[in-house]
């Protein structure tokens, strides 16, 4: 028995030195075998190919843009890159930066918002704030989203940015980050100011960003009536589509002498979320008619088809050279639905491209493969499959400890 144990121990020592030699060579060479997994993030592609030119819609406005909220696909456009004032639709960016401040912990919905002399002197639509008066951020957001209050927008801008000019700098920086190439903000509320310009396409980008990132904004934009000051101040939503159009959820209206009458309207039906931007309409009724025409077209021409995640998809992959044997997979990048033409008869399928194993180290969130979304044989989009946990590389000390524990078990 002692001879047998001795032989096993010797064999273990030999294995150890062979392991150490191999490990040391791999480390010393500075070379790593590349995993067959995709090494860079797969960017989602346009999920729908428009098969035909859209019809010429009669739109009583200077510019318009209709997009799918999920993908950003442009479904219809009219002078979408023509710069013009956008009035109170400007407040969408003010709201976006405010929700970001809440998300980052800078503010809460209960944070008191002071009213400065500057905010007090705002013209246009307002709730007649008085200097020194305070409302919670939640109340100010109601005033902005429901009544389009300029004084409330400026007061919030001063709270978030320290001053309105500093906040406007943040607005322009954020617009640049979003790719709003033809937008320049000069104030936080949208009053006509020289150089305060945007486009229908840029407004669609801005609207999509806040709706996808902070859908809680719809809690405010969907309010028809409310009150402030203990019921003394009545708020009535400027977006009359809330009462006229099935599925409308928001988002923001705007009217000035320079901009005309405008709206960025969001609506959802049967899982399809659309954003219709109308700029420079001659009247309020024209604004709502144009938005209705755009939304009607979008809901009639397109549908949201459910994306079927394969039932036999791998839930984990093996990892070589790690303390972890496997790493779980994350398919969250795949959308729940995909945009298709309404008449499309093709069935959606998902084709996975994954390696048999990964090479350590693997970090959580790392792209390890991709999922192709197909409609028939046509590729509708590509999405990353990611690691859902870390799998660190096994270092020499860990390997030695594991081998020692194994030898002790054999000797025992």
What are these regions, as identified by a protein language model?
Residues 180-184, 192-197, 201-412:
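Domain-terminus/edge residues, biased toward the C-terminal soluble/receptor-binding domains
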Residues 15-20, 312:
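Conserved, single-site charged/polar hotspot
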Residues 2-6, 22, 26-214:
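Active-site-adjacent loops and short helices of periplasmic peptidoglycan-processing enzymes
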Residues 3-16:
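Sec-dependent N-terminal signal peptides
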């Amino acid at each position: 028995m002692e001879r047998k144990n001795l032989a096993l121990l010797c064999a273990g020592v030999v294995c150890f030195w062979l392991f150490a030699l191999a490990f040391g060579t791999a480390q010393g060479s500075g070379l790593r075998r590349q995993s067959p997994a995709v090494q860079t993030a797969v960017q989602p592609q346009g999920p729908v190919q428009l098969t035909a030119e859209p019809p010429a819609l009669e739109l009583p406005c200077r510019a318009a843009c209709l997009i799918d909220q999920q993908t950003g696909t442009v479904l219809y456009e009219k002078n979408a890159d023509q710069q013009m004032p956008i009035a109170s639709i400007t407040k969408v960016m003010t709201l976006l930066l405010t929700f970001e401040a809440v998300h980052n912990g800078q503010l809460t919905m209960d944070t008191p918002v002071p009213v400065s002399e500057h905010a007090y002197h705002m013209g246009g639509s307002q709730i007649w704030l008085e200097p020194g008066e305070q409302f919670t951020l939640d109340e100010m957001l109601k005033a902005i989203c429901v009544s389009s209050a300029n004084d409330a927008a400026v007061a919030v801008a001063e709270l978030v940015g320290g001053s309105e000019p500093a906040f406007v700098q943040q607005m322009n920086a954020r617009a640049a980050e979003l790719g709003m190439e033809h937008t320049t903000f000069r104030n936080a509320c949208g009053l006509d100011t020289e150089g305060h310009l945007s486009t229908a396409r840029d407004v669609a980008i801005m609207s999509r960003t806040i709706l996808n990132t902070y859908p809680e904004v719809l809690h405010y934009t969907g309010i028809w009536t409310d009150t402030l000051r203990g019921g003394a101040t009545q708020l009535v939503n400027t977006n009359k589509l809330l009462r006229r159009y099935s599925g409308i959820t928001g988002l923001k209206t705007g009217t000035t002498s320079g901009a005309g009458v405008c709206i960025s309207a969001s609506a959802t039906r049967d899982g399809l979320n659309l954003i219709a931007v109308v700029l420079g309409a001659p009247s309020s009724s024209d604004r709502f008619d144009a938005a209705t025409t755009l939304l009607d077209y979008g809901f009639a021409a397109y549908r949201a088809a459910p994306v079927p995640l394969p039932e036999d998809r791998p839930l984990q992959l093996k990892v070589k050279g790690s303390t972890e044997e496997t790493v779980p997979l994350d398919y969250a990048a795949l959308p729940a639905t995909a945009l298709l033409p309404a008449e499309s008869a093709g069935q959606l399928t998902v084709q996975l491209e994954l390696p048999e194993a990964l090479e350590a180290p693997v970090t959580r969130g790392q792209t390890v493969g991709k999922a192709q979304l197909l409609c028939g044989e046509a590729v509708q989009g590509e999405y990353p499959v990611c690691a859902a946990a870390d799998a660190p590389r096994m270092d020499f000390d860990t390997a030695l400890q594991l081998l020692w524990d194994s030898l002790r078990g054999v000797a025992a």
